[in-house]
Structures are given as structure tokens and as C-alpha cells.
């Protein structure tokens, strides 16, 4: 019985039949289709992002939230989130009350256009600004910390940020400010 299976496998493995191409199948990416993600050269987007960082450093809540959509989803990598522009204003107004000063440096800006959602719609297609930066914060209790952060901001059709994801380790922030938070 085993020899029959081995012989059958050899015979099927040696099949030299040439498959005909009937032209019914096409390449998934034609010459006219767009790449899934494209780098975009958008100095207005970069300048607006820089202005947002400056407003935050100056504790200017109106300037910081000026480019947020009313229904913005603000998410941190640890799972916490805020929903709505007013919630972002309220949260950061409270944070500004415990921060002595904050400075951002070593910025990297990467504006991209996502022509398709990479995961079936769970992540929005469209214009995104990816940023990496160093943060130095001194709190009113005298404690100072330094860390790197990464933001991913999605822009809606009106040019406002409707998704704001921030990837940071919040543990050092919580430890440095826990005696200031009620």
C-alpha cells in the first residue's frame, strides 16, 4: 500500500503540463493604481504640527486644540482615551496646572497618505502625520523627567485631527506627578 502512495506521489509530482494563461487574472497592482502608503510633501501640515507643539509648550490650550475636530478620539498606547475636543481641553488644562515647564526637541515629521486601510477599516485611510520627539518636563514639585514619544494624527476631510494616538510610557509621568494629582 505504501508503495502505491509513493508511486502516485512521484507521478503527480512529475506532471509537466503547462498551464495556459487565459488572461482572466490580473496583477493586483496595475500601472495606474496608487501605493498603499505614500510620503507626502506637505509643508503646511508640518508647520501646523510645529505650531501645535509650540502652543503646548506655552500652555496655550486654545492653540493646542485649534486643529482638533470636535469629535476627536485621543488615545494613549496604554489604552486610556479621551473623546471630544472639550475632554482634551479639560484634561490638558488640569495637566498644565501641575507642569512648571515643558520643552520638545529633536522632532521628526513624517506626513503620509494612506490610500487603503492596512487592517480592513479598523485604522482610517487618508492623511496622517507621524511625529517622534524628545520631551523634557519639569513639574511644580521640582521633579523633572525626559522621554521620547511618538504621535500618529489622522486628518478628516475638513483638515482637522479626528484621531490622535500617542505612544509613550506613562509610568514615569505618573510617578513624577502623583503627589500633584488629586
Locate the predicted segments by residue.
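Surface-exposed, charged secondary-structure patches
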Residues: 92-141
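Hydrophobic pocket/interface hotspot
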Residues: 52, 63-65, 72, 84, ...
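A short gly/proline-enriched turn/hairpin at secondary-structure junctions
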Residues: 67, 73-83, 98
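Sec-dependent signal peptide recognition
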Residues: 1-5
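Short, surface-exposed coil-to-beta transition loops
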Residues: 132, 145-150
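Low-complexity, intrinsically disordered terminal/linker segments enriched in charged
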Residues: 162-182
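Short, low-complexity N-terminal intrinsically disordered segments enriched in polar/charged residues
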Residues: 15-58, 62, 66
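C-terminal motif of bacterial Sec signal peptides marking the signal peptidase cleavage site
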Residues: 10-13
